Every structure is written in C-alpha cells, then in structure tokens.
A protein has these predicted regions:
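Hydrophobic core segments of alpha-helical transmembrane domains in multi-pass membrane transport
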Residues: 32-47, 93-101, 132-136, 172-176, ...
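Core transmembrane alpha-helical segments of multi-pass membrane transporters/permeases
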Residues: 28-33, 37, 41, 62-110, ...
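Membrane-core helix-loop-helix motifs of multi-pass transport proteins
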Residues: 19, 23, 148, 152-243, ...
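Interfacial/capping segments of alpha-helical transmembrane domains
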Residues: 44-71, 186-190, 286-296, 367-376, ...
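Membrane-interfacial loop-to-helix junctions in multi-pass transporters
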Residues: 72, 82-90, 117-128, 162-164, ...
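Hydrophobic alpha-helical transmembrane segments of multi-pass integral membrane proteins
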Residues: 93-94, 121-152, 157, 351-358, ...
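Intrinsically disordered, low-complexity non-transmembrane regions of multi-pass membrane transporters
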Residues: 1-24, 53-68, 236-263, 509-516
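Interfacial loop/helix-cap signal at membrane boundaries in integral membrane proteins
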Residues: 9, 13-14, 52-90, 200-208, ...
Length: 516
C-alpha cells in the first residue's frame, strides 16, 4: 500500500543539501589529519607573532610554541607510542568492551531486552521502549543494533506498528548518551576527554564519571515524557499503513526459552553477589579499598568513582559468563576469550581514529594554543558581560549544528574540549556543566542526521516492514522528537545554570580556580 504521508518539500530540500554536504566531507580520520596540519600552521604563526597570555592559576606567562621547533619535532617522534596508548578514553573503551563482548555474544543483552519488553503493559509500551533504548546505549553500538530491530518485532507481536517501535527504540538510544537512568561507558569516555581539556588549565583536575547523573535523570524523564506524547499523538497516526509484511518465522524470537530464563536468573544472582562485594569493599571495617575514610567530605567516594571502569568490566564479564554457561553459548574458557576478541573487532576503525585524535590533543597542549585561546576568549567574554546562563545554550546549539558535519560525539568533543572547557572554567562554569551542555546538543541531531550511521541503519530496518519507506518519511517521523528535545534541553540547561543545581554526586555548576 502506498505511503500515506509525503515529505515536507522544505525539509526534503534541507535533507538533500545536508546529504550533499556530508558526501563531500572527508573521512573522520582525514578530518583530524587536516586539523593537525592547520594546528601546525597556526602554531608556527603564533610563535612568530609572539602570542602569549598569563596563566590565571600559576601566574606564569604562556607563549605559543611552534610545533615545527626542534624540541617539539623530537618529542613528536620519540613519544608517538606513548601519545597513542596514553590517550585517556582508549584504555577505558578497550577494558569495557572486553567485558561487554562476553555479555553480548553470550546472548545476555538480547535475552535481557526481550525479557523486559514482554513484561510491559500495552498502555506504557511507548515510554518503556524509549527507556530501554536509553539503557541499550550502555552496550555501545552492539546494544543498539540488537535492540532497534527487536523493538520492531515486539511491537508487531503486540499488534502495534513495528516501525513505531523501532523509531522509539532509536529515539531512546540516540538520546541515551545524555538522558539516562544510570551512567555508563559513554560517561567515562566523554569525561576522559573533558579531563584532558580541564588539565590544560588545572593539571590536578580529575574526572568524576557520575558528574552528570542528576542532570541526566532530568533530561531522561523529560525526553521520555515528550517522546511518549509525540509518539502516540503525532508519529503513530501518520506512519504508512502496515499490513503484516515482515512478520514471519522471526515472531517466535520474542519468546524466552527455558534455558534463557535460567540464564537470566543466574546472571541476576551474579549481579547481586557483585553488588554485595562492592558494598563490602566500601564498608568493611579496616579494609575499604573503594572508600577513603581519611579524605574530606565529598572526596571519600573518589576511589569508587575511579574504579567504575573495572567494576563495569567485571559486571559485563561475570554476568555474561553466568548466562552463557547456563544456555550453552559458553562451554569453556576459550569461548570467553573468543567473545572478547569478537567484541574488540568492531573497534578497529575507532582505534585508527584515536591514533590521530590523540596526537591532535597532545599537540594542541604542546603548542599552548589551547590555554591561550581559552584565557583570551574568557577575558573577552568577561568584558562583553555574557552571562553563563546564555553561554551554555549557545554551546548546546553549536554542538547540535556541528553534528551535521561530524557525526562522532567523541571526535567533536576531542576538538572542542581543549578550548571550551578551560575557557568556561575561567568564567566560573565547571567542566561537568560544560560537558552536560555539549552532550545535550550532540544527541539531538542524531535523530535526523544522515551522517549518523544509526539513522541510516534505522531506515534499513524500517524497510523490512514497509519496503516503500523513504528517507524523507523517516525524517518527518523523527523531526518532531528532535525539535521538542532541543527546546526542552535549552530550558533545562539554562534553568540548571540559573539555579546552580547539583549535576551529580559531588559536582555542581559553579567552579572556582585553585588559589595561586
């Protein structure tokens, strides 16, 4: 049956223009190579012109260094391996993916999502689908690839439009990087880059992976409520008619077998044991490696925060092992090793990208361009009198627009953080608040950007159920979510700054530079 909706002509022209622009952009690796070349040229020019600034914390004069100087060229070659392996997000990602690979390829993620979805009443199916999409982001791309088509199948089995299920699942997954119930891998990664930027100004600044948790909860509940209303009132009535196409033998895959249910029970038992062990390592008298009783208030949980990556690795590994052993996907230790290797395989493009991204970040630091640009930029903004309540919505909007040009959240933040984070620190805004504003903007255009691989995959998944569905139809369905989430994100961000609400455990909006 032909589609009952037609793409808006203006939106269609805009999308085609973005596609043409996106097709002309080089690969993200090439973008970083170009940026490194530009950085070298600017450093040479800045050193020749004598650009400098006084460091607001130490009082020392910072001068731009030419990246072609004998000292820095020697450093570039001698420290290349250390630059790559020492890049903060790299080790975090590798460790977590080793554990997540076992949980994914052992079947735990798929079974857990199916168990959760089949217990949901039809009346709250939409908000729960969005919520589970948010949680699926913690399994990285693997969770999204499993969950989005699975949501379509589960909606079809309940008599609802399968495309609606997949759109809602994708909406949750695409925005789950900022709005979520619990922090996860992305929080560790994004704050690793934030730490790199903050340490250009204050070398002792350390990240808190839970630094946006309360803010994330507010965004999550806002997006779930708005998504529920938009999905039910605007999107579902306008979707192309579905006549049962695509619902075949796969319908049974929504059911859990007896072995899968047994596996989930064992994984749940392991989860409880891990939680108990973690609490014990924080509260055992005389032996609490995850809690520093001698530290001042607000810093006592720092050992726990610093151990989150290791704890998440153990969580994924042991629950995945327990589940896989119960269902038969894991019969020996070699199976676990093989699953870890499979988990790492999709990271190969990321490992290549990080090689160039790490060099861009460290060379930015060597040149002193980052702190000098931040110091001078902060001074100019202070003279103009721009209020923080306006600065962060501007950053949010810029982040959203940049997503049409560079799809990777990590790539954009790697380029922006060395300037934006220290600049706003000098204006009294914490790195955690700056990170939160960036994250809100970054996730919005994931819903409608053809440069985002997830958006393209969503269209392919939808065409299984509606073969004639086109890009413009999907854009028309996703656009109301993006607009509503953008407006809500602006309001929440501005309100958070104005009221100076806590962002997470031990973090807030204001920031004061250390005394000299």
């Amino acid at each position: 049956m032909p589609s009952t909706i037609r793409p808006c002509s203006r939106a269609d022209r805009f999308l085609k223009a973005v596609e043409r622009l996106g097709n002309r952009l080089p690969d993200p690796v090439a973008i970083f190579v170009i940026m490194i070349g530009m950085l070298v040229a600017v450093s040479v020019l800045g050193a020749w012109l004598g650009w400098s600034s006084a460091h607001p914390v130490t009082g020392e004069t910072l001068a731009v260094k030419s990246l072609l100087s004998e000292e820095l060229v020697r450093q570039f070659f001698s420290e290349m391996p250390r630059t790559y392996t020492g890049f903060a997000p790299l080790g975090l990602v590798l460790v977590l993916i080793l554990g997540a690979g076992v949980a994914d390829h052992g079947g735990l993620f798929s079974a857990l999502l199916r168990w959760a979805m089949r217990r949901v009443p039809d009346g709250v199916l939409i908000p729960v689908t969005i919520l589970l999409g948010m949680l699926a982001t913690h399994a990285s791309d693997a969770g999204v690839l499993i969950y989005v088509p699975l949501a379509g199948l589960l909606f079809a089995n309940t008599g609802r439009h399968p495309v609606l299920g997949m759109i809602l699942a994708y909406v949750g997954a695409a925005t789950g990087l900022v709005g979520n119930i619990i922090p996860g891998l992305f929080d560790v990664n994004i704050f690793g880059i934030t730490e790199t930027g903050a340490q250009m100004l204050v070398p002792t600044w350390k990240m808190n992976p839970l630094g946006n948790w309360w803010f994330q909860l507010a965004i999550a509940f806002s997006n779930i409520g708005l998504g529920w209303f938009i999905g039910a009132k605007f999107v579902e009535p306008r979707l192309p008619a579905w006549q049962g196409h695509g619902l075949g033998e796969d319908a049974a895959c929504g059911q859990l077998s007896a072995g899968e249910r047994r596996g989930l029970r064992r994984a749940g038992l392991v989860l409880l044991l891990l939680v108990g062990a973690t609490v014990g390592l924080m509260a055992w008298p005389g032996y609490a490696p995850l809690y520093d009783y001698s530290a001042e208030a607000g810093q006592q949980l720092r050992p726990f925060f610093g151990s989150l990556v290791a704890l998440l690795f153990m969580l994924f590994l042991l629950t995945g092992w327990a589940y896989g052993h119960a269902v038969g996907t894991i019969s020996s230790f070699s199976d676990i090793v093989a699953m870890m290797a499979k988990g790492l395989a999709p990271l190969l493009p990321y490992l290549v990208l990080i090689f160039f991204a790490s060099h861009f970040v460290v060379m930015f630091g060597w040149s002193n361009l980052g702190p000098i640009a931040a110091i001078n930029g902060a001074a100019q903004l202070r003279e103009i009198g721009v209020q923080p309540v306006l600065l962060l919505p501007i950053l949010l909007t810029a982040s959203a627009l940049l997503d049409f040009l560079i799809a990777s959240a990590m790539a954009k933040w790697t380029a922006l953080a060395p300037v934006v984070v220290p600049m706003l620190m000098m204006l009294g805004i914490s790195p955690e608040m700056t990170t939160a504003a960036y994250r809100v903007g970054d996730t919005l255009t994931n819903l409608i950007s053809p440069l985002n691989s997830g958006f393209v995959l969503l269209l392919i998944f939808c065409q299984r159920w509606i073969p004639e569905m086109r890009l413009g139809t999907l854009l028309a369905a996703n656009l109301p979510f993006a607009i509503a989430f953008y407006i809500a994100g602006l309001v929440i961000t501005a309100g958070w700054v104005a009221l100076e609400l806590p962002l997470g455990p031990g973090t807030g909006v204001p920031y004061a530079l250390p005394a000299r």
